[in-house]
């Protein structure tokens, strides 16, 4: 994959801890920017990889985040306060992490960089019986979580170098398991 340098904010989290080893095995150089809020060691298996580095930082630290953004080819913003209950507990924190971080990234990314942004299906809000969502389905988020993620996607889509992915509920085994998801009780 050439010498692409990838920055993954929140890279030690549920999705990142599965994605980062895959990126490394595909030949990318990967930097994880994470505050390790859950005190996890989810990247232990890759910590000695020669193309891996970690910045123990908070995405609300503007200067630290900017320094990393400008030195990478691909940015994958995974850092987030995830789910409606967590966002409702601290709406200000959720806005800062889920939206303001992305607004800042959009200011610092150059035309030669790429942003890959996973978005939640919570942006759709409550669906209608018998109607399936697709790319053209109107977004009507009802939770603060969905609202911040949809607003972040809107900011990024104004740029030309962005790909967004609307993910359904992500589930399954991960080095940083999410035990707050009912679906993971069945995995």
Question: How does the language model describe each region?
Answer:
Residues 1-74:
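N-terminal Rossmann/SDR dinucleotide-binding element
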Residues 9, 33, 75-79, 115-121, ...:
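SDR active-site strand-loop-helix element
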Residues 16, 63, 85, 125-128:
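Glycine/Thr-rich phosphate-binding loops of Rossmann-like dinucleotide-binding domains
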Residues 59-96:
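NAD(P)H-binding glycine-rich loop region in Rossmannoid oxidoreductase-like domains
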Residues 67-68, 108, 155:
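CheY-like receiver
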Residues 89-92, 96-104, 123-164, 169-178:
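Catalytic helix-loop patch of NAD(P)-dependent Rossmann-fold dehydrogenases
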Residues 110-114:
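A short helix->loop->beta-strand "cap" motif at the edges of active sites that frequently abuts
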Residues 184-187:
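Alpha-helical substrate-binding/gating segment
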């Amino acid at each position: 994959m050439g010498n692409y340098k990838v920055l993954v904010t929140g890279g030690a989290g549920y999705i990142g801890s599965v994605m980062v080893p895959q990126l490394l095995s595909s030949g990318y150089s990967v930097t994880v920017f994470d505050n390790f809020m859950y005190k996890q060691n989810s990247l232990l298996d890759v910590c000695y990889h020669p193309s891996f580095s970690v910045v123990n930082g908070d995405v609300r630290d503007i200067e630290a985040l900017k320094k990393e953004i400008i030195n990478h080819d691909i940015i994958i913003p995974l850092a987030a306060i995830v789910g409606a209950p967590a966002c409702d507990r601290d709406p200000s924190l959720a806005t800062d992490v889920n939206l303001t971080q992305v607004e800042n990234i959009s200011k610092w990314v150059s035309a030669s960089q790429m942003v890959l942004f996973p978005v939640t299906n919570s942006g759709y809000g409550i669906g209608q019986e018998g109607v399936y969502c697709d790319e053209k389905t109107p977004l009507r988020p009802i939770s603060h979580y969905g609202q911040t993620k949809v607003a972040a996607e809107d900011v990024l889509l104004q740029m030309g170098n962005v790909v967004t992915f609307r993910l359904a509920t992500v589930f399954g085994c991960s080095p940083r398991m999410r035990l707050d998801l009912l679906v993971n009780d069945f995995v």
